[in-house]
């Protein structure tokens, strides 16, 4: 029985005002997906996992992309798919996107499809449909490419890797006792359909500030760019502790802070000028004030999805 296994890292989408556009892959967590071909003359997908994920192929973020690839490319096979979840689910860390990305990469390797990175993103987006009903591309793009990415087009898929000329580390405040059913779907429903022109202009300025800050290595521009007037504000009921954590992060000279994806996790960028211990200590106290138990995770920028070698 031939098998392939791939690993994809967690990610933080939006990065302030870059809703459905920007995302960052990091080493905080990763998912692994192993796909084995049992027979090539029938069509069946059996799912195994260490987590309570849907076992129906069309409802599973790892296997629904495979269903679509097989339909589109006329591939017939009976598959056993093992999804090893390392990324906490429903916490704004790209869990479904990483599973989808790892699955598509393993499948591409198994069937020698040699899919381009953009095709990996395009197929992995089906995993987001299975998870939340929306094919948002930002998390899967980060998990595919690694680093910081901008999704500049979805039809066709076009992703640009953002050059990083400023060295920073990552702190994540990850709530352990928050669980919201269909969180991503609900969070997307909270995003306003219309916005004030002044908010739109400010958000456009933030995006340009962040990207220029990354490219030119300018700390102040990165800090300014990690702000948002629209989406974070609309979703604040999901993470009421966020404004104070951000205030603490800036107080102790973090590069900047924002909500990780749809939350409730919070992303803080740090460097040699930052007092990480104070941010972790006071940020954890803030979580507790809101009856939220937060784990603080230290991470770095991650690379893209990879096929794991078998010993």
Swiss-Prot record:
InterPro entries in alphabetical order: GHMP_kinase_C_dom (IPR013750), GHMP_kinase_C_sf (IPR036554), GHMP_kinase_N_dom (IPR006204), GHMP_knse_ATP-bd_CS (IPR006203), Homoserine_kinase (IPR000870), Ribosomal_Su5_D2-typ_SF (IPR020568), Ribsml_uS5_D2-typ_fold_subgr (IPR014721)
Pfam families xref list: GHMP_kinases_C, GHMP_kinases_N
Highest taxon, organism lineage: Archaea
Gene3D superfamilies: 3.30.230.10, GHMP kinase, C-terminal domain
Main location class: cytoplasm
Binding-site residues for ATP, renumbered to this chain: 88-98
Catalytic activity: L-homoserine + ATP = O-phospho-L-homoserine + ADP + H(+)
Pathway the protein acts in: Amino-acid biosynthesis; L-threonine biosynthesis; L-threonine from L-aspartate: step 4/5
EC supergroup of this enzyme: transferase
MF GO annotations: ATP binding; homoserine kinase activity
Family: Belongs to the GHMP kinase family. Homoserine kinase subfamily.
Function of the protein: Catalyzes the ATP-dependent phosphorylation of L-homoserine to L-homoserine phosphate.
NCBIfam families: PRK01212.1-4, thrB
UniProt protein name: Homoserine kinase
Species this protein is from: Saccharolobus islandicus (strain Y.G.57.14 / Yellowstone #1) (Sulfolobus islandicus)
Designated gene of the protein: thrB
